[in-house]
């Protein structure tokens, strides 16, 4: 008896399983879940219940329609013979009609007798129909299962065939690769043989080329002497022609000269053609000569020129044609083809060009100029300039920019005069604006720069003067920025610039010396003159400013001011008491000793200098420091040197410009204006300027933008030209250099000066084996674009007093980019040095571990030749390396394969014991040979 589940039966009846379960429960069939099995008796009970509930004699359901759909697959061969699987869907629809045999009009009594047999027959027919339906469903399920089984078997068969074909293809490919490798090896051997032959041929060709070059040099020297002689004769002839042109009415007699004309020789023609490169398009005398008859190629030049100088109007009005003007008559008055006419025409051009004197042009060469522009200025073809540069060893294109030095050398080589010029420079207008200002110069406060070695107390000295604690706020207690302050004293205002003393901040100290009037040289009494002290003295002397020496830490017990004076005298800083010009003042930043004397000496020097500057004028000054603030944008600390800077002024600073939106003093308070010698912080520039750039106030914002754009373009072109000039030199250096490891880094700092100093310090760490490669250096926080650049260049990112934003941190974590944060320059340099040390290849050293003497040699089966040895010193270990000495001469170096002691394989044998030693891949040993055993150890290297 067939059975299926409630869910399957519900899907056949197109009902939900829940509805079918309710009907089964009402029919007395206990089924709890859709997965329960249904038997044929359960279905009959359900059918009986439904018939009873709907009634059999009411006639409500007279017609039942059953729809059946089945899907099967058949395999059909197509035209190519391949078997294709076709899906076949069969739909069947059957309608069952219940017929009522009751005849209308018959009596009530007779009706049961007639209708009862009909109802039983109908029930029996219905049950038979349902049984047939169930059987058909079961048969359909069996067909589907068999079709699925056949499909699975067919799929497995196809997979097996595909695997067999793949294995056969792999074997075929392996065989093909083996054949190709054999062919490649044969080709490589042939290529090596060809390379050797080619190298020999090249060596022979080089030797021949050297001999030819020597011969060519001798020939060129002789040709140059001949050329000079011909040029001298041509100049003399040109002078004679000028003299004849002074009297045009005089008829010249045709007379054959004694020596041949310079224009008749090919070499002379080439020289004459070279001389005409600088000649204008039309010159007096050349155009009439072109119209002269060309009939007699051997005629005297004076006879030809006489007709042209006579000024024949018919000759002047003659139309120029592409052919010969003489009607095709050749040199011997015979008609000739196009070749003869061309030679005649060339001869005429040579005769015209010979007496022309080369014109020397004064070429104005800017900082950068392209090859095409340079050729245009010299009135020659660009190909001539390219040839000249190729002779100098530079491969250039017509649009390639040249730096000023290279361009001037080319101009001189071409026989012209080179003049340094900056034409069309919009900065010329700035001088006019400044020179147009007429303002009264008034006394101004001195600008004093405090310089000295690191940790000698510069910032602490300023702390006491300012009554502030600046040094405590600096990272590591060392200054890493230029600090600008102005202090009001009873005798006037003094502006102080505090420069870093660390060796990395050389550029900052140089900027501080250039912007200052007086230098306070700080030297610790207990430390003396140090390297940065000497450097500060050089900067001060180069700037030509007076030096006031402050001997700090004078209250310490181990202070020795006299030693400091002697060391400074050796550096040509002589104290006043020794007859010099520099006052020496011992001071203490803790007790305040000597501070007043120091300020008095500074103000005394300022009075001697008579410092003055205009006040009611547009401001000019110097950019001390610059940074990119996240909230405020580009911020620059500037020192006003003359004039008055106000909020709203248009400022030009280097390659940037902008309008001053806000101005703060050193205490962070807003101010409206700043006079001479006052440091302020300004906002509103278009970009971060370079520290050390000069700034000025202009009246026109448009002009300021133009000048800034011009400066940026000039800087970019100059940089590009210098890079191009250095490329050829670097090619050979890179070819000769070995395998050099690169350590790419990206630097982001809070201010321009710190970024510059950190980059210089890290680049100094480069060695012959490891090179620090600066991918990018900038000012501001670490952004996502910086991290993406680090991903592309595989660089590490160093942040100095800055941090990465959220997006940059997320990108760095996802791509394993190293982000390093520092606030002390010492730490950044030390950690990068340690990282570079880790990149160095370890050093391999040999360490001797023992020696042995071979006393006997025997051959063991399955082992080979064994050295019966006595360990004289140290020990011998398995797999250690050895040197075989015979008569104190090393004849072999190899590895010990095994060591045996009393037929036992051991790891080591110490001094004083005998053992058998098997040498790896070596058997030529004799009695009396010595064995030295050693190990190779790798030792980490440091920078």
From Swiss-Prot:
Q: Which GO terms describe its molecular function?
A: GTP binding; GTPase activity; translation initiation factor activity
Note down the stretches annotated as region G3.
498-501
Q: Which domain of life is it from?
A: Bacteria
Which part of the chain is the tr-type G domain? 443-612
Segments for region (G2): 477-481
What keywords does the record list, in alphabetical order? Cytoplasm, GTP-binding, Initiation factor, Nucleotide-binding, Protein biosynthesis
Q: Which residue ranges have biased composition labelled Basic and acidic residues?
A: 123-166, 174-192, 205-232, 313-323
Q: Which GO terms describe its cellular component?
A: cytosol
Ubl conjugation keyword on record: no
Compositional bias, Low complexity, is annotated for 193-204, 280-292
Q: Which Pfam families match?
A: EF-G_D2, GTP_EFTU, IF-2, IF2_assoc, IF2_N
Q: Give the matching InterPro entries.
A: DNA-bd_dom_put_sf, EF-G-like_DII, IF2_assoc_dom_bac, IF2_II, IF2_N, P-loop_NTPase, Small_GTP-bd, T_Tr_GTP-bd_dom
Q: What is its main location?
A: cytoplasm
Region called G5, residue ranges: 588-590
Q: Which residues cross the membrane?
A: none
Q: Region (Disordered) spans which residues?
A: 57-85, 97-232, 245-358
Region spans: G1: 452-459
- Where is GTP bound in this sequence? 452-459, 498-502, 552-555
Annotated region described as G4, given as residue ranges: 552-555
The reply to whether Lyase figures as a keyword in the UniProt entry is no
Q: What does this protein do?
A: One of the essential components for the initiation of protein synthesis. Protects formylmethionyl-tRNA from spontaneous hydrolysis and promotes its binding to the 30S ribosomal subunits. Also involved in the hydrolysis of GTP during the formation of the 70S ribosomal complex.
The molecule here is called Translation initiation factor IF-2
Q: Name the encoding gene, please.
A: infB
């Amino acid at each position: 008896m067939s059975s299926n589940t409630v869910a399957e039966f519900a899907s056949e009846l197109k009902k939900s399983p829940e509805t079918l379960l309710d009907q089964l429960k009402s029919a007395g069939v206990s089924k709890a879940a859709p997965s329960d099995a249904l038997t044929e008796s359960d279905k009959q009970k359900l059918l009986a219940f439904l018939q009873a509930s709907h009634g059999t004699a009411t006639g409500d359901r007279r017609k039942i329609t059953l729809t059946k759909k089945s899907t099967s697959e058949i395999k059909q061969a197509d035209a190519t013979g391949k078997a294709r699987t076709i899906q076949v869907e069969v739909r069947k629809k059957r309608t069952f009609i219940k017929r009522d045999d009751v005849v209308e009009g018959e009596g009530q009594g007779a009706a049961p007798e007639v209708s009862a047999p009909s109802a039983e027959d109908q029930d029996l027919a219905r049950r038979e129909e349902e049984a047939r339906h169930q059987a058909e469903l079961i048969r359909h399920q069996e067909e589907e299962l068999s079709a699925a089984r056949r499909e699975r078997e067919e799929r497995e068969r196809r997979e097996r065939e595909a695997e067999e074909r793949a294995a056969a293809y792999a074997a075929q490919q392996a065989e093909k690769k083996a054949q190709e490798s054999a062919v490649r090896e044969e080709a490589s051997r042939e290529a090596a043989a060809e390379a050797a032959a080619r190298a020999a041929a090249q060596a022979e060709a080089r030797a021949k080329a050297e001999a030819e070059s020597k011969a060519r040099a001798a020939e060129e020297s002789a040709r140059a002497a001949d050329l000079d002689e011909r040029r001298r004769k041509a100049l003399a002839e040109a002078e004679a022609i000028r003299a004849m042109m002074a009297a045009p009415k005089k008829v010249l007699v045709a007379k054959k000269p004694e020596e041949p004309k310079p224009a008749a020789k090919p070499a002379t023609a080439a020289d004459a053609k070279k001389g005409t490169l600088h000649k204008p398009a039309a010159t007096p005398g050349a155009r009439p000569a072109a119209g002269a008859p060309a009939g007699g190629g051997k005629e005297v030049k004076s006879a030809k020129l006489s007709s042209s100088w006579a000024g024949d109007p018919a000759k002047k009005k003659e139309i120029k044609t592409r052919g010969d003007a003489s009607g095709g008559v050749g040199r011997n008055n015979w008609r000739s083809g196009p070749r003869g006419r061309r030679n005649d025409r060339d001869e005429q051009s040579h005769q015209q060009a010979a007496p022309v004197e080369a014109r020397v042009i004064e070429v104005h060469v800017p900082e950068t100029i392209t090859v095409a522009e340079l050729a245009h200025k010299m009135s020659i073809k660009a190909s001539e300039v390219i040839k000249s540069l190729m002779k100098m060893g530079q491969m250039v294109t017509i649009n390639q920019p040249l730096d000023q030095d290279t361009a001037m050398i080319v101009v001189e080589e071409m026989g012209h005069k080179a003049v340094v010029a900056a034409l069309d420079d919009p900065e010329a207008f700035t001088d006019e604006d400044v020179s147009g200002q007429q303002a009264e110069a008034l006394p101004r406060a001195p600008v004093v720069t405090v310089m000295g070695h690191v940790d000698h107390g510069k910032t602490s000295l300023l702390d006491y003067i300012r009554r502030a604690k600046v040094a405590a706020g600096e990272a590591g207690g060392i200054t890493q920025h230029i600090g600008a302050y102005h202090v009001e004293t009873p005798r006037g205002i003094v502006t102080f610039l505090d420069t870093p003393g660390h060796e990395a901040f050389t550029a900052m100290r140089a900027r501080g010396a250039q912007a200052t009037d007086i230098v306070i040289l700080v030297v610790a009494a207990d430390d003396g003159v140090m390297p940065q002290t000497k450097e500060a003295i050089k900067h001060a002397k180069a700037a030509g400013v007076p030096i006031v020496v402050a001997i700090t830490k004078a209250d310490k017990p181990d202070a020795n001011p006299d030693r400091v004076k002697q060391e400074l005298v050796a550096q040509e800083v002589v104290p006043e008491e020794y007859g010099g010009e520099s006052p020496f003042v011992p001071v203490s930043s803790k007790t305040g000793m000597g501070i007043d004397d120091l300020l008095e000496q500074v103000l005394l020097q300022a009075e001697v200098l008579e410092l003055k500057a205009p006040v009611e004028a547009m401001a000019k000054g110097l950019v001390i420091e610059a940074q990119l603030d996240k909230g405020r944008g580009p911020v620059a600390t500037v020192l006003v040197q003359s004039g008055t800077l106000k909020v709203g002024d248009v400022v030009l600073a280097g390659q940037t410009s902008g309008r001053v939106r806000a101005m703060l003093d050193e205490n962070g308070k807003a101010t409206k204006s700043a006079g001479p010698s006052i440091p302020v912080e300004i906002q509103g520039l278009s970009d971060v300027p370079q520290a050390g750039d000069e700034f000025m106030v202009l009246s026109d914002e448009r002009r300021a933008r133009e000048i800034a754009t011009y400066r940026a373009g000039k800087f970019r072109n100059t940089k590009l030209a210098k890079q191009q000039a250095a490329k050829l030199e670097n090619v050979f250096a890179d070819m000769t250099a070995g395998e050099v490891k690169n350590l790419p880094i990206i630097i982001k700092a809070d201010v321009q000066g710190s970024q510059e100093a950190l980059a210089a310090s890290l680049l100094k760490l480069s060695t012959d084996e490891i090179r620090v490669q600066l991918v990018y250096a900038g000012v501001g926080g670490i952004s996502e674009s910086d991290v993406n650049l680090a991903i592309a260049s595989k660089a590490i990112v160093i942040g100095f007093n800055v941090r990465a934003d959220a997006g940059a941190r997320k990108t760095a974590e996802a791509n394993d980019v190293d982000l390093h944060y520092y606030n002390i320059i010492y730490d950044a340099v030390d950690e990068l040095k340690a990282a570079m040390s880790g990149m160095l290849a370890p050093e391999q050293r040999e360490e001797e571990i023992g020696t042995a003497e071979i006393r006997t040699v025997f051959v063991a089966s399955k082992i080979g030749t064994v050295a019966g040895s006595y360990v004289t010193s140290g020990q011998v270990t398995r797999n250690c390396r050895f040197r075989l000495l015979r008569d104190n001469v090393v004849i072999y170096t190899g590895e010990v394969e095994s060591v045996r002691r009393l037929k036992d394989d051991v790891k080591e044998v110490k001094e004083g014991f005998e053992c058998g030693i098997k040498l790896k891949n070596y058997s030529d040993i004799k009695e009396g040979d010595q064995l030295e055993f050693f190990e190779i150890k790798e030792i980490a290297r440091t920078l």
